[in-house]
Amino acid sequence: MVEAAPRSAGNRTRESLAPRETVPVGAMAPLAAVRDSVVRAHQATIAAASAVARATLRDGLNPAPRQLGEKTWPETVDTFSTTRAAELAAVRCFRPLARSAKRELSSEDIDVLTRGGIEQVFGPTHRQTATDHATGRTIAANSMLTVASHGQVESIEGLESSPRGADFGGLTVRYNGDPVAAARSAAEVFGVFVGLHLCMSDCVAESQAHGTAPNPPSSQRLSLRVVEIDLVPIPHLRARVSIDGLEPSRDNGFDVTVDFIPRNGVPLGPGTNGHLQDWTGRVATTGRQALLSEFHMAHLARGDQGIAFGPEFSRYTGNRATRLPTGGLLLVDRVTEFSGTRGNWDAGADYRTEYDVPADAWYLEDTANGSVPHFVYMETSLQAALLMGYYLGPTLGSTETLRLRNLGGTATVSRRLDLRGKTVDQSSTLVSTTLMPGSSLQSFDYSLRVDGDEFYSGTTMFGYFSDSALDNQTGLDAGRHRPNWLETLESAPQIRTIDVAARRDRREPLCCTGALALVDHVDVVDGGGQYGKGYLHMTRDIEADEWFFDCHFYLDPVIPGSLGVESVIQCIQEWMVDVGMHRQWRDPQFHIPENVPFNWKYRGQFVPDDGHCELEVHVKDIRTQADSVVVVADASLWKPGLRIYELIDISVELREGI
């Protein structure tokens, strides 16, 4: 979870950028000096626009029963008002809590579901356990949860989930009797298919129909498409039902909703002082019970922080407080181990978390990389690191609401792995906590593993800041203007422009598209820059309706710094393609190089009203081998008048497809 950088769409204005001091970010300065520079580095011009507030909490956790009645049919599916259609997948996405290979259900399968046999039908990914605190024994969770008992459903086919956009998946039903009852049963089946019940150890599925019930049709077949699904305030979905395969309309079709509601007395989150119990019922990939689940991550991002972290955090709900990103930028799922104690900030607190990388993730479709893009490595590791550091409660002693900003770090990819469809095991250790008036600092070590193999590790520092501490943003250069390299030249060099937007095509494997189309053009000075090996420059507008403001963060919109890094990477990638480095391979792919430590430093943030941002890249080294070419560079990013990001040894590899 970082802050600030750019996206692209449409025409962008151009300007220039500037050099930087080559000070390794990984070497953390004394905390007092860091604090002094950081507190001056931010600006309190964050508009508290709630573009993401479509997920407003409904009243209470037990919604009033819904009645079948008149329905207003919208022309389009409700979504975030600021989101462009091409970027909807990144903002309004839902990742199933469990995935099953089941695509068809027989009448026997449905009968098993009516008797609570969810794992029996959908497999071990849907397994839940809990602890009987009276005996200490492991018992089955949600053993009383039954679904699909409302209507006579003969069979279900075409069962599939989609992670994004206006359609989250659906199914087709053959039934006898009442189509409304059959649709309610089918919607409940979809809910357990994607694992909504896994958020709680003991819940009930409450389904209701909305709209005009159709006359009993001659057909005994209906289709159901899920148009809304979420974990906040409680796991729920809304589906549109059409009879006999016809599209929903005012004359044919209706809506069905399902809420998964905790039974009376079932705790939803940690207790006072962050006491963690074996009540979630969620099973981690390791087979152990998860301490916190996807449900708690969603509430920490944009719901009730008291549910997420315990009653002490309730005062942050609805405020511009520290949060995880939401939507497609939420890249941590579960907490599986935790050795710390709330209120104790001594170094050494360890914790482990998990993130499931969907094989069909939006960023895999939009990236130019052969596997996940660089920002995913950064976001999933940094979100995991800060998560339990915040849980320890460093902000609870302040009378002000504090917001989180990443300040810098260093990280290295040690092994090239394809992460698609894998569960990333994230290990984090709190190195230090320093509490100061109006702010506090925490530093962490972290590493990522898949199937026991470490592939990424690093260190990072976060700061928690009050509004007053964010009032003065002085950037990396103590408030002075730092000119870009072009501005330091006595005479204008020869500049050529790479028109990235003109070649952008989803059929082009070496081009970022959709929400990751962060670059429209790159200005190039061949043989230029600080190292005489090439200079890249880009300026782009920042628009208030950029998709990432919907995701990062709720009530506190700033551009993720990881997307600033991603923008620099895309400039380098476009330059590598432009000069023909890819032509020697039949199936060239971009990757993150192994064993090239990358350092970053953030001393500011990009906010919706900044207007534009600027970046420059100094090509530092070109390493050519028989099977690959690696470009290493340094870069800086500016907001108007201030240089706020510095990247040292950012690198891109181009090689034959693996």
Model-assigned labels for residue ranges:
Residues V2-T13, V23-A29, A33, R40, ...:
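Non-catalytic linker/capping segments at the edges of enzyme domains
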Residues M28, A32-I46, S50-L57, L61, ...:
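Long amphipathic alpha-helical coiled-coil
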Residues V52-T79:
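Extended low-complexity, intrinsically disordered segments associated with secretion/export
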Residues A134-R137, S143-V226, D230-S249:
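Structured N-terminal alpha/beta-domain signature
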Residues E160, Y175-Q208, V335, P358-D360, ...:
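Active-site helix/loop of acyl-thioester processing domains in fatty-acid/polyketide metabolism
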Residues D202-S207, R405-A411, E594-W600:
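Short, structured beta-strand/loop micro-motifs enriched in basic residues and often containing a Trp
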Residues N215-R221, L417-D425, F606-E614:
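Short nucleic-acid-contacting surface segments enriched for D/E, G, S/T with interspersed K/R
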Residues L222-E228, V424-L430, C613-V619:
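Short tryptophan-centered beta-strand motifs in secreted/extracellular beta-sheet-rich domains
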